[in-house]
Amino acid sequence: MKYDIIGDIHGCLQEFQNLTEKLGYNWSSGLPVHPDQRKLAFVGDITDRGPHSLRMIEIVWELVIHKKVAYYAPGNHCNKLYRFFLGRNVTVAHGLETTVAEYEALPSHKQNMIKEKFITLYEQSPLYHVLDEKRLLVCHAGIRQDYIGRQDKKVQTFVLYGDITGEKHADGSPVRRDWAKEYKGTTWIVYGHTPVKEPRFVNHTVNIDTGAVFGGRLTALRYPEMETVSVPSSLPFVPEKFRPIS
């Protein structure tokens, strides 16, 4: 099987359409379909900050849950939206406010439909996907070699948030260790979470979050070709969001 793994979309629907078309997908059915049966995989954070978060929920639900032709691994923004939909006490900030504004503008029956779709998508998706006979792993923020195969709380924190130190940057965002430099495995780990200006290949890991929602690009990794394909963002460039790992 061949896969096209998509970086953090964050509600950037137009960029997602542009990227999938560039990858050879046809949207005539209303969903991206590849003539060679390639499958899409999402590294999470499909919502928040961008203009079309709810439409992205519908598309990913349709592909992953209804048609079962794609893969989705939740990100930290997905986890927070999930908790919001469950009625938990979450701070509506750091991008969640844009998704909530879209949601609250809907009539109640459409709100319920979106909520049910996202809760189902989140609950039926694993923390990470191991594909191609363990040669490929798709997750949100990365994973340590010794965590592969585990699903416990420590692993959940790592795949959602990265290798956080507990310290904070001046803007309140967490300081993260560069786990990829220590990775010695042969399974390719494809992830996002931390915006980088160019796709970052380190050992057998690839960070494909090129900051579409911050004016960078939306990037896909074609597997097993190991080629990256990108399209430019339509949003303003925010250089301070492209931070070094540590």
UniProtKB/Swiss-Prot annotation:
GO molecular function terms here?
A: bis(5'-nucleosyl)-tetraphosphatase (asymmetrical) activity; nickel cation binding; phosphatase activity
Name the cofactor(s) required for activity, per the record.
Answer: Ni(2+)
Q: What EC class is this?
A: hydrolase
User: CDD domains of this UniProt entry?
Assistant: MPP_Prp_like
The UniProt keyword set, sorted, is:
Hydrolase, Nickel
GO cellular component terms, semicolon-separated: cytoplasm
Catalyses which reaction? P(1),P(4)-bis(5'-guanosyl) tetraphosphate + H2O = GMP + GTP + 2 H(+)
Q: Which InterPro entries match?
A: Ap4A_hydrolase, Bis(5'-nucleosyl)-tetraP_PrpE, Calcineurin-like_PHP_ApaH, Metallo-depent_PP-like, MPP_PrpE-like
EC number(s) for this protein? 3.6.1.17
- Family note: Belongs to the PrpE family.
Q: What is the stated purpose of this protein?
A: Asymmetrically hydrolyzes Ap4p to yield AMP and ATP.
Its recorded name reads Bis(5'-nucleosyl)-tetraphosphatase PrpE [asymmetrical]
Organism encoding this protein: Bacillus cereus (strain AH820)
Tell me the organism's taxonomic lineage: Bacteria, Bacillati, Bacillota, Bacilli, Bacillales
